[in-house]
Amino acid sequence: MKNIFMAVIEFYQRFISPVLPNSCRYYPSCSEYSLHEFKFNSFFGAFFATVLRILRCNPLFRGGIDYPLVRLKIQHQKAIFKICRSEVKFWFVPCKSGKFYVIKSFKKEK
């Protein structure tokens, strides 16, 4: 079910959003916010957070920066150093115990 919603959002971002003017009052945009929610949270939690975000995205609210908040259990491991060439796609910034803000990492331009 999550994959269906994510596919619809990606379709919207790729084909519909470029035709419309920029109107989202928040950063990241509502569609990007909902993609992160569906990627890292349960279906119902992500759906509820997305609906609330879309309802807040209007002239009656200030807008601003509103990163998605996700629950993660991070395993603490001993430091193992090895060379790897993987790129960082998301940063998880601690907020409360077990909750993190999801911040997307952008590609570095040369």
Swiss-Prot record:
Gene Ontology CC annotations of this record: plasma membrane
Key word Chaperone present: no
Subcellular location: Cell inner membrane
Primary residence: membrane
Keyword line: Cell inner membrane, Cell membrane, Membrane
Membrane topology: Peripheral membrane protein
Name of a matching Pfam family: YidD
InterPro entries xref list: Membr_insert_effic_factor_YidD
SMART domains, per database record: Haemolytic
NCBIfam families: membrane protein insertion efficiency factor YidD
Family: Belongs to the UPF0161 family.
Function: Could be involved in insertion of integral membrane proteins into the membrane.
Protein name: Putative membrane protein insertion efficiency factor
Organism: Campylobacter hominis (strain ATCC BAA-381 / DSM 21671 / CCUG 45161 / LMG 19568 / NCTC 13146 / CH001A)
Organism ancestry: Bacteria, Pseudomonadati, Campylobacterota, Epsilonproteobacteria, Campylobacterales
